[in-house]
Amino acid sequence: GKAFPTFAYGCIVAEVEVDMKTGYVDVLEVTASHDVGTAINPALVKGQIYGGIVMGQGFAVTEDVVTGKRGQKTKNFDSYILPTSMDAPKMNINIYENQDPAGTYGAKSIGEPATEGVGAAIANAIFNATGRRVYENPADLETVLLGHKLQ
């Protein structure tokens, strides 16, 4: 059978700067190109992609859910760091319209596709900057400089 009536395609590329003394990853620029079917409201489509980039940036470099024997330890925004508009990188958005016969008015989904590739793009940019692969999120001091979390 067919799992989905249609598929959303996109490509995301990130540019980062990594401080090799602290492991701090600064996401400088993200370019996202997405086939959105018919962009019924192009401004809202771009807004969704902007939000998805910042959300993916959070997953990749700042947000960390820490748990222990007694449950979740990160219970407030002092320890669970969400990116703000001040943390947002320069963003370049490219919308490609390719009317989808299965989509309402020819549109495709853009909510999840806008977020899904950002972490991988940032991880690949970290690899290009440092020569080290990041396999865990967030990309912090331990994962960037050592390749794993300290126990």
Model feature map: region roles:
Residues 1-151:
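C-terminal catalytic domains of large/alpha subunits in multi-subunit enzymes
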